[in-house]
Amino acid sequence: MGAQLRVYRQKIKSAHRTKKITRAMELISASRIQKEQARVAASSPYARAITRAVSAVATYSNVGHVLTTEPEKIERAVIVIFSSDRGLAGAFNSNVLKESEKLAELLRSQGKEVVYFLIGRKAQGYFSFRRRAFERVWTGNTDAPEFEQAKEVADAILESFLRDSADGGVDEIHVIYNRFVSMLTQEPQVVRLLPMEVVEGVEEPDRTQVLPLYEFEPDVNTVLDSLLPVYIESRIFNAMLQSAASKHAATQKAMKAASDNADKLITDYTRLANNARQAEITQQISEIVGGADALSSAN
């Protein structure tokens, strides 16, 4: 009985220690998410504005630019997966990885070769464990993304897209990340980044509305050459920020659930320890009474 009581007390201490850790991680994530939410709110209007600008130029110029024109045959497609460097975030990483598997299966069914660009150690570990090849990987800044890394990713995407297919170039770019909706909801988002869908961000004009007349200096291709890299950089950076905010929200939610589970374990083991202690006391009293009866009988 005493050994069982010691086991329960050890488990209670262990649950208390675990609760301290999960509670601290919950508070850290809560403090970080405020900053990442502000960064998402600051970057999203610019990303939408640059998307509308590029879409408008491509739509109203009637010029076939390489980054906005659908190729006749798509042979290779890149999937850029945004994961985190650390775990303890519930289904945050598994959701984007599941979406990547679905998208890869769809692309392969269309006869396309799939190439992976990975962001975050969790995606890297997922592919390395399964011994699956990936082209590029970036790690280290997923909790607090910096624009320099977003620019590096965007440059790699553009370089692969503009490279000839015979030299290992790609014809299509897709990105998969968790979009921050609220503290309780983070949705996996699948977006085709290139070739750009020019309808995105441009509303259909009313039939009675006079269409805008654009003039481009020095010419349309030069304007698009300047705008599209900025567009890719802003979209990649916004996806990084959305992913970071979603990760902190998922971590806070997971750690809150872990703290609640620790509380429940403490309550359950405390009740079991009390029962064991009561049984031990009852047994001791019974032994004392039995011994006293034996002595009185002997006398």
Swiss-Prot record:
It is found in: Cell membrane. InterPro entries: ATP_synth_F1_ATPase_gsu, ATP_synth_F1_gsu. GO terms for biological process: proton motive force-driven plasma membrane ATP synthesis. Its main location: membrane. The keyword Ion transport applies. Disulfide bonds: none annotated. The keyword Transport applies. One of its GO terms (cellular component) is plasma membrane. Pfam families: ATP-synt. It is a peripheral membrane protein. GO terms for molecular function: ATP binding; proton-transporting ATP synthase activity, rotational mechanism. Keywords: ATP synthesis, Cell membrane, CF(1), Hydrogen ion transport, Ion transport, Membrane, Transport. Belongs to the ATPase gamma chain family. PANTHER family: ATP SYNTHASE GAMMA CHAIN (PTHR11693), ATP SYNTHASE SUBUNIT GAMMA, MITOCHONDRIAL (PTHR11693:SF22). Produces ATP from ADP in the presence of a proton gradient across the membrane. The gamma chain is believed to be important in regulating ATPase activity and the flow of protons through the CF(0) complex. F-type ATPases have 2 components, CF(1) - the catalytic core - and CF(0) - the membrane proton channel. CF(1) has five subunits: alpha(3), beta(3), gamma(1), delta(1), epsilon(1). CF(0) has three main subunits: a, b and c. This is ATP synthase gamma chain. It comes from Leifsonia xyli subsp. xyli (strain CTCB07).
